[in-house]
Amino acid sequence: MAIVNVNHFLKEVESTDLKIDAIASSELYKDATFFKPDVLNCIKRFESNVKVSQGQGDGLVLSDFKLLDDTEIDSIRKKSNKYKYLHYGVILVGIKAMLPNFRGMEGRVIVYDGACLDPERGHICSYLFRFESDCCYFGLRPEHCLSTTDVNLAKRFRFRVDFDCPQYEQDTELFALDIGVAYRCVNSARFLETKTGDSGWASQAISGCEALKYNEEIKMAILDHKSPLFLEEGAPNVHIEKRMFRGDKIRRSRSISAKRGPNSRSKETRGFRSLSARIERFGKDEFGRRASTSEAPPGRSVSVEDTDRPGKGNSDGSSP
């Protein structure tokens, strides 16, 4: 199951305020139509833009980064009396290079469940990105729902991103990372089908990315704990789009700057962490083997061509 039409997405993504807005709600859920404004209004969007700065010539790692901020989590929990489940319709990851001679540079993104104590069972997907243009993109559509009352809701989707990083002066911003999500609260899995009738797991290498299989290197990366870089988060942004005959379209985003702080080696906080060796020294096997298009290994990381997708969800609740 393809999540997006690649040509259409690449055309739209550069003309939107938020990258996640390049994917229409109607592509994610079959009941998200012009004739159902209540459904369109219940689909929320949130995006994080992170500027990654160099630190003393080391490679850089974004580790244990959470998908939603506290405001989004609080909003979801306030709806728990009305809705039992949370579903992510799509998670979009974009990596942008902001330096010369970027072509051929590589890195890796690992998505995992931060509440799972077994890294293999908690692994969601991994991608190798290689810059052939200045931007790389991939998307994933989880099959499972989450509980709106889960005390560990903020941990359930976490990210680790390894960047190949040449030597630059301290605090030079070299990469931008955009992680956007469209989600909705529901009471029934039957409302989670796309307009083509699919409801199973999907991930898609949209541009400059290849899926990786779970292996020992990915396991150690998930378990890795190193001193983080300093995270400086700015005030959240609210994007409002006026619409005729419907309520205003409201989305939220946040901007984060990641750089080496004065206490980055001694103070343990969540966020970016320094890497002792540059990623370009890693061999292909250390990044992880590319995922087969017909294989779904434990801790799945499969491409959209996988023909053995899980079945559709069952109807067991009411419409949002």
From Swiss-Prot:
GO terms for biological process: proteolysis; transport of virus in host, cell to cell. Residues 251-320 are annotated as: Disordered. Residues 278-289 have a biased composition (Basic and acidic residues). Its EC number is 3.4.21.-. The active site is at H144, D171, S199. GO terms for molecular function: RNA binding; serine-type endopeptidase activity. InterPro entries: Trichovirus_mp, Viral_movement. Transmembrane segments: none annotated. Keywords: Hydrolase, RNA-binding, Transport, Viral movement protein. May play a role in viral cell to cell movement by increasing the size exclusion limit of plasmodesmata and forming a complex with viral RNA to assist its movement. May also have a papain-like protease activity and cleave the genome polyprotein. Belongs to the tobamoviruses movement protein family. This is Putative movement protein.
